[in-house]
Curated annotation (Swiss-Prot):
EC number(s) given by UniProt: 1.8.4.10
Phylogenetic lineage: Bacteria, Bacillati, Actinomycetota, Actinomycetes, Mycobacteriales
Single GO MF annotation: metal ion binding
Coiled coil: none
Entry cofactors: [4Fe-4S] cluster
Origin species: Mycolicibacterium smegmatis (strain ATCC 700084 / mc(2)155)
The protein's name in its UniProt record: Adenosine 5'-phosphosulfate reductase
Annotated pathway: Sulfur metabolism; hydrogen sulfide biosynthesis; sulfite from sulfate
Cofactor comment text: Binds 1 [4Fe-4S] cluster per subunit.
Length: 236
């Protein structure tokens, strides 16, 4: 295994390019094994705690793997409960990342309900900036985004260089369909956020998440009525 902690950006970019070419048709398990082989303990798995599919798979490859959760201060109670259950059930180390300011401090400084007045700035302060800081300690991050989730994710690669955060990005289940997800959940008894079964196929912060209309893409319930469709973490 290459010591990625001393690798240059160009070397990591080249590694991502080689991986993308060699694993174009790889399974999720193969992608996770490739990640572990090349990055050892220097990668993190990001989870929004909608379900624990990726967490469970990663824990089988590397027990005790770091699992990053962005605790924005605006999550549903069910999401926080799922985070706590994930930490209790799976062999992982949950890294709970919080913004610089609490919601109360942000309200005092910028006014209440910034999420309604300027959702882009709210996401930047409570998601993008904290994630940027948290990822500085890693050479790669693994995410659970899937191509079927929204048009903005339709071309999500399996492995790439993430220009926004300056590290390698692996999306092991990018090619999975909703049926693939449900089959894996059923076959392995995976923890799922109870809100999923209440009609929320995409779960973010409570003030900015609603149930999508039938037939709409799963993320249409996020920032409903606004042109905003992504929080800034997954820039295509």
């Amino acid at each position: 295994m290459t010591d990625v902690t001393t690798s240059t950006e160009n070397e990591l970019r080249e590694l991502a390019e080689r991986g993308a070419a060699e694993l174009a048709d790889a399974s999720a398990e193969e992608l996770l094994r490739w990640t572990d082989e090349h990055f050892g303990g220097n990668y993190v798995v990001a989870s929004n705690m909608q379900d624990a599919v990726l967490v469970e798979m990663a824990a089988k490859v590397r027990p005790g793997v770091d699992v990053l959760f962005l605790d924005t201060g605006y999550h549903f109670a069910e999401t926080i409960g799922t985070r706590d259950a994930v930490e209790a059930v799976y062999d992982v180390h949950v890294v709970n990342v919080t913004p610089e300011r609490t919601v109360a401090e942000q309200d005092e400084l910028l006014g209440k309900n910034l999420f309604a007045r300027d959702p882009g700035e709210c996401c930047r302060l409570r998601k993008v900036v904290p994630l940027t800081n948290a990822l500085k300690g890693y050479s790669a991050w693994v995410t659970g985004i899937r191509r079927v989730e929204a048009p903005t994710r339709a071309n999500a690669p399996l492995i790439s260089w993430d220009n926004a955060f300056g590290l390698v990005k692996i999306n092991p289940i990018a090619a999975w369909t909703d049926e693939d997800m449900q089959n894996y959940i059923d076959a392995n008894g995976i923890l799922v956020n109870p809100l999923v079964y209440e009609g929320y196929p995409s779960i973010g912060c409570a003030p900015c998440t609603s149930k999508p209309i039938p037939g709409a893409d799963p993320r249409s319930g996020r920032w409903a009525g606004l042109s905003k469709t992504e929080c800034g973490l997954h820039v295509s």
